A protein has these predicted regions:
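Nucleotide/phosphate-binding catalytic cleft detector across ATP-hydrolyzing
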Residues: 1-71, 79-198, 205-252
Length: 252
């Protein structure tokens, strides 16, 4: 009988997989086993903030400390990196997916309008904001959904200030994670961060006014990295292509 099962990966292939810094040993083992079952001969793991830093062009092997915040879909990763290691870190399960849920719940609560997660995502993209005052605000956005009172289709206009209100608690949680990571950062690295500032990566970094809000609470410069959506993927690819250079940054 012909075996119709085929591995997705050639047996000799090495694989570098990005994982959250707050992952448990059980979760880490599950990731590794999944890769091995897929056919990977050698599996390396790299933490998301480390990959984001590499993909953002930060010299992670340098002695100077750099802080990066990677706001992805499921988690927000905050890390201070120096000499190829993570000196301090904080991971919270508040990121893009949670922001979408916040918007969906806000629409139900404040407007009696039921919307789906894809619609919430579009609201976030079009009028999402972390602050209630923007110098260059986006135009109001028309939202379509189901009226919870009458059960019929309905549309309303929503502005960025409403979205900022909807996201406030989740943004607070991200700010708390940043402050916690800063509070346990060694003094020498804190001095470096004071000079270089904080780097923002991931899809959440594109939320309007988030950089200003983090700047306000930390009193540090905040920079959105170039092409933040691909920073983690780009950094993981760079680590894979340069395993000799970045071997110490990955784990078996």
């Amino acid at each position: 009988m012909t075996n119709t099962k085929h591995s997705l990966i050639t047996p000799a292939m090495k694989m570098v997989i990005c994982i959250p810094s707050g992952i448990t040993e059980v979760e880490e083992r599950a990731v590794r086993e999944s890769a091995e079952q897929a056919g990977a001969k050698e599996v390396r793991l790299i933490y998301e903030p480390m990959a984001a830093a590499i993909g953002s062009g930060i010299d992670v092997l340098d002695a100077n400390g750099n802080m990066i915040i990677d706001i992805g879909g499921g988690t927000s990763e905050v890390a201070v990196i120096a000499l190829g290691s993570i000196a301090s870190k904080k991971s919270v399960q508040v990121a893009g997916d949670r922001l979408n849920t916040d918007i969906k719940e806000f629409m139900r609560r404040e407007h009696n309008l039921d919307i789906g997660i894809p619609t919430a995502e579009q609201i976030k993209i079009n009028v999402g904001a972390a602050v209630t005052h923007l110098d260059n605000p986006p135009a109001d956005y028309e939202v379509y959904g189901r009226d919870l009172v009458h059960g019929i289709p309905r549309s309303i206009m929503i502005n960025y200030q409403e979205v900022a209100t909807a996201l406030n608690n989740s943004i607070n949680a991200i700010e708390d994670a940043v402050m916690q990571a800063l509070n346990v950062t060694p003094p020498e690295l804190s001095a470096d961060i004071f000079k270089t500032g904080i780097y923002l990566a991931g899809s959440g970094s594109l939320l309007r006014g988030l950089d200003k809000r983090i700047n306000k609470i930390t009193q540090l410069p905040v920079h959105v990295v170039e092409d933040p959506l691909r920073a983690v993927a780009r950094g993981t690819a760079i680590a894979l292509k340069n395993l000799d250079k970045f071997e110490s940054l990955t784990k078996y």
